[in-house]
């Protein structure tokens, strides 16, 4: 899957643009505030139905306009799929996929598997477990078709259980939720762990180039110590504690990935630049996995490619990007090193004051 064409109207400071993309590497060049990140944001919106910069649609729509419109053509093994998306400042949404209107923006995710890497991306490792669960679940979603309906059901059960915790007086009143919750939680955890075990060899291959001086260990934590007791036992034993805090304290919603160097979390050992390289290794490995195991092409959005990376690391990273068999969109402030890094593989777009031209 790759994005072959994008038409933009009234998105951020981009009033109008029609762009045909390289199936491999696309470099977006422009000074800060020019609109290069807005271009990546528009692509992200088409892939996930939301922005990575704000949750307010009004901030994405061009200042004096009422709505923005995005139209794209996505190439897959069966040909071209047209997708159109319009959102207004008032929140109204129109989505059309392959000629049919769709009500759910979540339907977009299956057509354009997107990975976003920003200068703040190191929070995947230094931030909360929620970030690492999202990373893991992105891969499981595309690898195992049963995962998404199972996880959606678990989230509904947890919402109902947490509401019931505030009302019930004995654990028996929660059994109606916990019986199904425990079965689905075991399935979800097995799906996550199986994917993680397949992914990590690809991560370690990339880390050998990116961070050769460090020996990094990895561990999947399912959300409870299943070697000690079952989730059913945890929920029973923690009933009064959970009732006091008002939510369920064990289960797949508490899962995490743990990366350590000599027993110490990587976020306490590595610099920000090194953490960024680690994140690149994780994301690129997911792209390789998607291509090798699931026969799908990943689309990478890399904002501020050279941030906190010396020329040697940029060269190593560029080599892995070229070999990733993914479609890449990279934003940079200056283009002087682009040919050195990517040769003739790329198409270069220049952005200034929201106007986009092709080199």
Swiss-Prot record:
Pfam families per record: SMC_N
Localization in the cell: Cytoplasm
InterPro entries documented for this protein: DNA-binding_RecF, DNA-binding_RecF_CS, P-loop_NTPase, RecF/RecN/SMC_N, RecF_2
Transmembrane region(s): none
Keywords, comma-separated and alphabetical: ATP-binding, Cytoplasm, DNA damage, DNA repair, DNA replication, DNA-binding, Nucleotide-binding, SOS response
GO CC annotations, alphabetized: cytoplasm
Biological-process GO terms, alphabetical: DNA replication; DNA synthesis involved in DNA repair; double-strand break repair; SOS response
Annotated GO MF terms: ATP binding; single-stranded DNA binding
Residues annotated as binding ATP: 30-37
Superkingdom assignment: Bacteria
Main localization (coarse): cytoplasm
Family: Belongs to the RecF family.
Function: The RecF protein is involved in DNA metabolism; it is required for DNA replication and normal SOS inducibility. RecF binds preferentially to single-stranded, linear DNA. It also seems to bind ATP.
Name of this protein: DNA replication and repair protein RecF
